[in-house]
């Protein structure tokens, strides 16, 4: 153990991934994973599981050598999925056009005013009216959380920001749609703003608890948190935009796969098999696929950028039940495998009985599955069950039922992969190159990570008849991904050359007398502003800046095209700091 105290490279990265079943922690020194820990996630109080994982992974290490801590957490995801978010008063400025009564999570409060597609304020929102309405609405709701979103607010955030100033006298937390996303799509921005305010209280408490836990262990390194788009940012900054930390589990998986260097350039299906679910992601030419416009939060489409990841209800602790003469595997999880002291048999128990896993008590797992086999035989003898072509008629022993359990799990995973591939191959084509040279996704390679990867991964490869890779440290891939995540921020600059107007919605900036005339000039300005913002946040200013999108439209007036509408979106390139050995 003493040898661990002398670490090559001097500085270490600590990664934490709070999953639905397990909380993982890793320490990375240079390009080596030098310590790992896996502890059960304590849903009633996440900090208990986080504390246990920290204590386990830090044993024998000098915490003063930790350079950065990066966390991937389910706290926001759980709040949203379980519908436990706080009440939010949602204010919208829609102007004419589409009826939005039924597309938001709550009934919005409509405010007078209108900004057109060029960013021209056609009708101002009266300040005194906002104050009066806010007092009345807040008295009824009793909440101190609000969200504000205006149609075409990304073209001119003036109305959103002025309304926010008026609401500060009434509400403690206010989110703006245009500050969260610079992209056109009023409904998505509005939904993001609503959920951003709704999860702020729980995120703020969680942030304080994590900071206290690190402080108690003498960890003074900067604390970052992973975002759904695979980037990380300082926890302090994310207090104003916690909705972006939802669904970070898939992001951690994707980054972990990148860091482990196992994807290659083939069409690859990556599986992260946890205790409850299997996350499926597709990779083309070494890059993961992203959602087109943003991730859906419950049934509501948001502006939060995310990797395209789909989950199916199969995990190591998927419960096994006999229902109406049928054997089901998942999607529910009720606790640990019987081999680990649980009360109902799981997929993990089946893997233990078949010799694919060697944890826990084999005898307990075998006895539980034998009891299930006996129950199946008793059910088949009932006159109420149709035994024709029923697989259950062959079940006699614990091994028989274990094989059937694994087969059903593999069928569910295969179906999930087929559906994801089908959706990908039906995506709309936007450029001529994709018509001339279509890149149809045909799986060529499977990569499996997650706690159940070593136990189920080989069977998946055999079942799908594809080569399968299970990397070293597959069980803690998500924590590795979190530890190595690069910082990312995204900015949008919109320039109207006729009006000499420059707008940066994410920063709430509106500048008159802009002299930029060409797209190349706007790109350079965007890079300059992004570098300045990165410096302000204490990020690595040497990191590559990526131009995500350029839109350049001529403005035709009097049969002449003299002016332009130019929109440029840039970001610090997402990815990992380096590979691990």
Q: What are the residue ranges of the model-derived segments?
A:
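N-terminally biased helix-coil "hinge/interface" segments that flank
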Residues: 4-581
């Amino acid at each position: 153990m003493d040898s661990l105290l002398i670490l090559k490279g001097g500085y270490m990265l600590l990664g934490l991934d709070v999953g639905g079943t397990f909380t993982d922690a890793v320490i990375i020194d240079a390009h080596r994973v030098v310590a790992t820990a896996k502890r059960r996630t304590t849903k009633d109080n996440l900090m208990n599981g986080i504390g246990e994982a920290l204590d386990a992974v830090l044993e024998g290490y000098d915490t003063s050598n930790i350079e950065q801590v990066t966390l991937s957490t389910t706290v926001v995801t759980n709040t949203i999925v379980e519908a436990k978010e706080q009440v939010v008063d949602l204010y919208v400025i829609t102007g004419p056009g589409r009826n939005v009564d039924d597309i938001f999570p709550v009934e919005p409060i409509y405010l007078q005013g209108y900004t057109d597609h060029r960013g021209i304020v056609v009708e101002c929102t009266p300040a005194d009216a906002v104050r009066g309405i806010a007092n009345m609405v807040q008295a009824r709701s009793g909440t101190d959380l609000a969200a504000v979103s205006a149609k075409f607010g990304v073209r001119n955030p003036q109305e959103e920001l002025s309304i926010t100033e008026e609401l500060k006298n009434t509400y403690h937390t206010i989110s703006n749609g245009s500050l969260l996303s610079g992209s056109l799509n009023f409904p998505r921005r509005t939904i993001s703003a609503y959920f951003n305010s709704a999860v702020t209280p729980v995120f703020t408490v969680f942030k304080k608890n994590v900071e206290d836990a690190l402080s108690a262990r003498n960890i003074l390194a900067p604390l970052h948190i992973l975002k759904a788009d695979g980037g990380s940012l300082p926890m302090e900054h994310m207090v104003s935009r916690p909705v972006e930390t939802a669904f970070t589990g898939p992001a951690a998986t994707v980054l972990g796969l990148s860091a482990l260097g196992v994807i290659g350039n083939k069409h690859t299906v990556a599986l992260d098999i946890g205790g409850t679910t299997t996350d499926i992601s597709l990779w083309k030419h070494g890059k993961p696929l992203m959602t087109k416009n943003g991730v859906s939060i419950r049934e509501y489409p948001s502006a939060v950028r995310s990797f395209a990841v789909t989950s199916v209800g199969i995990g190591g602790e998927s419960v096994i039940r006999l229902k109406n003469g049928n054997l089901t595997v998942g999607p529910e999880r009720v606790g640990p495998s019987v081999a680990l002291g649980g009360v109902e048999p799981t997929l993990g128990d089946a893997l233990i009985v078949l010799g694919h896993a060697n944890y826990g008590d084999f005898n307990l797992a075998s006895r539980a599955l034998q009891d299930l086999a006996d129950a199946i035989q008793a059910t088949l003898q009932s006159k109420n069950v149709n035994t024709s072509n029923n697989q259950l008629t062959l079940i006699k022993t614990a091994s028989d039922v274990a094989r059937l359990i694994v087969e059903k799990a593999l069928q569910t995973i295969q179906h999930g992969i087929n559906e994801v591939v089908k959706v990908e191959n039906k995506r709309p084509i936007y450029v001529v190159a994709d018509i001339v040279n279509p890149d149809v996704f045909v799986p060529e390679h499977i990569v499996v990570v997650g706690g159940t990867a070593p136990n189920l991964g080989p069977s998946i490869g055999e079942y799908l008849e594809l080569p399968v890779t299970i990397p070293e440290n597959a069980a803690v891939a998500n924590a590795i991904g979190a530890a190595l995540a690069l910082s990312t921020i995204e900015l949008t600059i919109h320039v109207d050359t006729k009006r000499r107007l420059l707008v940066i919605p994410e920063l709430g900036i509106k500048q008159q007398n802009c002299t930029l005339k060409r797209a190349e000039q706007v790109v350079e300005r965007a890079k300059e502003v992004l570098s300045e913002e990165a410096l302000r946040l204490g990020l690595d200013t040497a990191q590559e800046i990526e131009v995500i999108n350029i839109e350049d439209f001529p403005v035709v007036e009097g049969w002449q095209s003299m002016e332009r509408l130019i929109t440029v979106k840039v970001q610090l390139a997402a990815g990992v700091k380096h590979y691990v050995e």
